[in-house]
């Protein structure tokens, strides 16, 4: 079964699946080839930085940038690329880059995977230092790449993340139909 056959979650948009592409602590940007289901090395980060948390996407979604909805999963351990995590969205980071609007849904593992995050309901519940690390990473990780840039615009709440996932599911269905 390919990732395109994996539903967007157990009860989306509140209970989602995230296909992990990049493990926490990696300085390598991996990307899943949607046609083959194979994970490729997209590039090594040019900066002396690493992904602060696991990073992936919600299957069967299509964001405004033409890719599946991106998700940064706050967790305690790195997860191998290709693994699927059951998650709960808590908010979103709105950004802009050289290609246009680029939003990142922020999520935590579902309570059945790790109850440590059961008290985190929105990004506002995250420690300030965690939000600052995420913002700092995305503001700087492309800096040394020619022609690339990122501007972090603002944090959005849980409802915005849910709407982004819903829209991604609808876009995917429309695109698949025709």
From Swiss-Prot:
GO biological process: phosphate-containing compound metabolic process
Subcellular location, record wording: Cytoplasm
Catalytic activity: diphosphate + H2O = 2 phosphate + H(+)
Positions that bind Mg(2+) 2: 70
Binding site for substrate: 29, 43, 55, 141
Residues given in the record as Mg(2+) 1 binding sites: 65, 70, 102
Pfam families found in the cross-reference section: Pyrophosphatase
Gene Ontology MF terms: inorganic diphosphate phosphatase activity; magnesium ion binding
Cofactor(s), by name: Mg(2+)
InterPro entries to which the protein is assigned, alphabetical: Pyrophosphatase, Pyrophosphatase_sf
Listed EC numbers: 3.6.1.1
Sorted UniProt keywords: Cytoplasm, Hydrolase, Magnesium, Metal-binding
CDD domains for this protein: pyrophosphatase
Transmembrane segments: none
GO cellular component, one term: cytosol
Its biological purpose: Catalyzes the hydrolysis of inorganic pyrophosphate (PPi) forming two phosphate ions.
Family listed: Belongs to the PPase family.
Subunit and interaction comment: Homohexamer.
Name listed for the protein in its UniProt record: Inorganic pyrophosphatase
